[in-house]
């Protein structure tokens, strides 16, 4: 199978699963969930659905459990909306890349603040008006 077809299918599944989660899944334990990506196996029979979940760690775990309980329903809805010989088995995975990116941004900001403080100290120590 061509890589281009697989990429298009992954994007289409991402859109459809996002729509199902927003409009069809009524479980209150599934909080604010965003589908960040879908990774299909080569034979299109397995899909890892990466999700980002807003909230505290405990709420994220509850949402992930709610998604796991709703997997059968989501898969059946997916089968109604996409024409494939086999609807892929779905596994939800928590996408930690957003949290990792936030952590890196915080570290970079701290480094920049440290550099700004050093620059200000250098300017104060090298004030030409003191001569």
Curated annotation (Swiss-Prot):
Molecular function, one GO term: ribosomal small subunit binding
Residue ranges, annotated region (Disordered): 110-131
Keywords: Cytoplasm, Ribosome biogenesis
SUPFAM superfamilies: Ribosome-binding factor A, RbfA (SSF89919)
Major location category of this protein: cytoplasm
GO cellular component, one term: cytosol
GO BP terms: maturation of SSU-rRNA
Subcellular location: Cytoplasm
Annotated family: Belongs to the RbfA family.
Complex and partners: Monomer. Binds 30S ribosomal subunits, but not 50S ribosomal subunits or 70S ribosomes.
Function, in words: One of several proteins that assist in the late maturation steps of the functional core of the 30S ribosomal subunit. Associates with free 30S ribosomal subunits (but not with 30S subunits that are part of 70S ribosomes or polysomes). Required for efficient processing of 16S rRNA. May interact with the 5'-terminal helix region of 16S rRNA.
PANTHER family (alphabetical): RIBOSOME-BINDING FACTOR A, CHLOROPLASTIC-RELATED (PTHR33515:SF1)
HAMAP family: RbfA
Protein name, entry field: Ribosome-binding factor A
Native species: Natranaerobius thermophilus (strain ATCC BAA-1301 / DSM 18059 / JW/NM-WN-LF)
């Amino acid at each position: 199978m061509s890589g281009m077809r697989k990429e298009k299918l992954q994007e289409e599944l991402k859109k459809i699963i996002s729509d199902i989660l927003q409009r069809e899944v009524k479980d209150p334990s599934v909080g604010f969930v965003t589908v960040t990506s879908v990774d299909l196996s080569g034979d299109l029979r397995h899909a890892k659905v990466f999700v980002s979940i807003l909230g505290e760690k405990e709420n994220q775990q509850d949402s992930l459990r709610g998604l796991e309980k709703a997997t059968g329903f989501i898969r059946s809805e997916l089968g109604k909306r996409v024409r494939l010989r086999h609807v892929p088995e779905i596994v939800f995975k928590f996408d930690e890349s957003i949290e990792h990116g936030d952590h890196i941004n915080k570290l970079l900001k701290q480094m920049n603040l440290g550099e700004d403080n050093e620059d200000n100290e250098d300017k104060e120590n090298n004030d030409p008006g003191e001569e």
